[in-house]
């Protein structure tokens, strides 16, 4: 099974986790790699399960690989905006070249240069040939609300990564336009 980026209410899809949402709530800018327009497929865990469970033990799946992803592929700008909207604020985005992020933080950069900086859109036709009723129905906007609501339910879940927070301050200062 090839799920790509599957998430649940506990997973903020930005390095530093809750840090990006907390920054937005504080009126601070957040870093989005590149120009923010690369497409990224985020799949809600419940949608993944709808594709995965019917494949279990199915004779046509033995020894074969299947993508199980959403058909929705928002841009990274849209992902940030959905989280901001769910948090009741506006996203203030500063675009930073992926290479610059990688130079400043090799761990963050590895996930960008090897993956997230490139558009990722998947074809689920093979999955649908075995599970024709598969449809991902949970858009990231709904998932973003679940993420924010879950974190808001218990303040101990709102963990800010001080290293990523400071790095974002540094990158924002360097790459802010205007």
Residue ranges of each PLM-predicted region?
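Mid/C-terminal beta-alpha module of Rossmann-like enzyme folds, strongest
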Residues: 54-113, 124, 129-130, 146, ...
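Substrate-positioning beta->alpha
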Residues: 14-20, 33-56, 63-64
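Residue-level signal for the nucleotide or nucleotide-sugar donor/cofactor binding architecture
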Residues: 43, 71-74, 122, 135-138
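Conserved beta-loop-beta element that borders a ligand/cofactor-binding pocket
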Residues: 1-10
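A short C-terminal helix-loop "cap" of Rossmann-like NAD(P)-dependent dehydrogenase/epimerase domains
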Residues: 20-33, 89-92, 125
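Glycine/small-residue-rich pyrophosphate-binding loop that anchors the diphosphate of NDP-sugar donors
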Residues: 39, 116-119
């Amino acid at each position: 099974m090839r799920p790509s980026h599957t998430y649940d209410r506990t997973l903020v899809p930005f390095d530093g986790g809750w840090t990006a949402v907390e920054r937005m709530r504080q009126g601070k800018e957040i870093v989005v790699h590149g120009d923010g327009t690369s497409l990224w497929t985020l799949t809600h865990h419940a949608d993944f399960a709808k594709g995965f469970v019917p494949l279990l033990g199915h004779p046509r799946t033995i020894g074969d690989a299947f993508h199980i992803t959403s058909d929705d592929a928002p841009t990274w700008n849209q992902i940030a905006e959905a989280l901001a909207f769910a948090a009741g604020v506006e996203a203030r985005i500063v675009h930073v070249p992926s290479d610059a992020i990688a130079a400043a933080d090799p761990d963050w950069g590895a996930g960008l240069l090897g993956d997230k900086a490139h558009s990722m859109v998947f074809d689920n036709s093979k999955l649908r040939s075995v599970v024709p009723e598969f449809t991902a129905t949970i858009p990231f906007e709904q998932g973003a609300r679940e993420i924010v609501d879950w974190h808001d339910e218990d303040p101990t879940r709102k963990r800010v990564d001080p290293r990523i927070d400071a790095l974002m301050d540094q990158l924002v200062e360097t790459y802010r336009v205007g």
